[in-house]
Amino acid sequence: KTTTAGSISTESCSTENILTKKEGLLQDSIQAMKEKLRQDSIQWEKQLSAVTIKGTRSQFRQKNGGIVARISGTSLEKEPTATEVLAKLPGMFKDKDGKPQAFIGGAPEIYINERKVQDYSVVENLPVTQIKEVKVIHHPGAEYGNNVGCVLLITTKKNLQGLAIVENSGFLFDSYVSNNHDLDLTYTHGKMTYYGKLGYANWQGIWKEQDIATNYVSGSQAGDNTGNNAGNNATTYIASATLDCKHSYNDHFYWSAGADLALTEKQTIGVKYDGYNIHQPMPFKMTSYAMTNDHVDDNVTGDNKFLYYDWQHHVNAFYQGNYGEKWKLNIFGDFVKLHTEQGQFVDEISEKNLANGVSEEEARNKFTLLPQSDGTIWGAKARANYTINDKQTWMMGAEYNYVKSESRTDYTPADKGTSTHSITKENHAAVFAEYSLDFKPFSLRVGLRYEHVDSRLDSHAPLHRKYDNLYPSLLLSHQSGRFSQSLSYRSSETRPSFQELNTGTVYANRYMRQVGNSQLEPSQRHEFQYQASYGDLFLQASYTYVKDYITSIIEPYSDDPQTGYITWTNIDHCWNWGSFLG
């Protein structure tokens, strides 16, 4: 106690009493705290019982220079076909033939579980429910050929033990009813997996197209169909052809079988065989006319027909293995045998010839044109990946392809055109290497590819060409939360196809022929691309400079300016830019 004088005095009490009082106060405090926590807990449970916590996981993510799209468990899994899934990926759309196409890179090169797809029907008949994810690569690195502008890597779900039987059927109601059916069997027992597929598709429809060519001739100077007049006194020649098919159908049989063996947990081997047979008749009505200035010179009508017939056999073998924590090795081998026919049955009659007094039989132009080819492809590819550390990786590999094709074009009767026969052979070898560095928030990928190509065309005008080139590539990426962006550069080359080089003449219609150009040079491409994404938003922009750009043109025939020739030529250079936001 404190007195008024400020002195201090204490009451007499024992140490034991003090401790007893403290313990009592402590116990009371603990009990009060427990009761308070219990009441709070009850109150929180009541409040949380009415609360649902939701999280949103992005369907797309950036990974190693590509965009990985989850398919399983997302809205994309509800799409009717794999084609619809691929067409809805960032930067992709569906072209007029119903196949996925990149807005900037063109037709993609597609892989399923790292196996290259040789025939697109394999993708068409892949059940959507079996797709786990798809990686879209809009700036391919050194591993891929210089003619590849986009890559799609499809990963499927793992097979479970036991037998799985899947039957898929589909119907399309349009001008006609189309349908497709396939039966898919998979059996997994221990380390072995066996699988097979058998399918049939019938597609029916109508189509119509029109071709118009305009040629300008002034004296001995000829223009072209670009609209560039040869002078004020030029004569204008116009030729037009309309093809109208009222009923086209496609019978498509396809099949596959294979087996995979897991040698160990980290090593797998497998072999797969697949094939198809396609028969597609396309009868159509052909109407065409020719004009000189404003005067109609002739009208031609015809009941013509296209007949396409293709078959293919493909065998693939592979080995995939991991060695320790750093090495990964993939080896693939392919053999392809294929046959293609593109028959054309022509039965045309000219009003001009009838007006000149000739008989209907003499005025009729009737013949059969049958281009066909048989091809063989051998291919092998090996790729090794080495993890230097958690920030650096190294990839290297090599591939070789041998292609042989024998083509011939026959006219019946023989006097209706010039028959051709040619044999093409191509040896294509490549080695590639790529280094990746991750220094967050940035990552860098640098690649270099070397290609050697030896191609030979044996025909009435033999051609032999060799190409040896280096193709560098660079990719710089940045990641910050849900926002990612990348800048890339790639050098590549587009070589002319044998169709573009072959100087044999092919009949297109009454006023149009096709002939190749043996003097074509390869096109050199330099592409810069910027890509950005935030969540599910995607932006893509590119600029491409092309030296010796290959393009098709229509030139007038010297003896008949109303008849045009579709051919190909090199333009000194061109550039283009494109962008996509979605």
Locations of the language-model features?
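Short acidic/polar hinge/loop motifs at secondary-structure boundaries
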Residues: 113-140
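Face-selective signature of the C-terminal outer-membrane beta-barrel domain
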Residues: 256, 260-278, 304-460, 479, ...
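Outer-membrane beta-barrel signature, preferentially recognizing the C-terminal barrel domain
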Residues: 423-426, 465, 493-547, 564-580
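Short strand-turn segments of transmembrane beta-barrel domains in outer membranes
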Residues: 72-73, 161-185
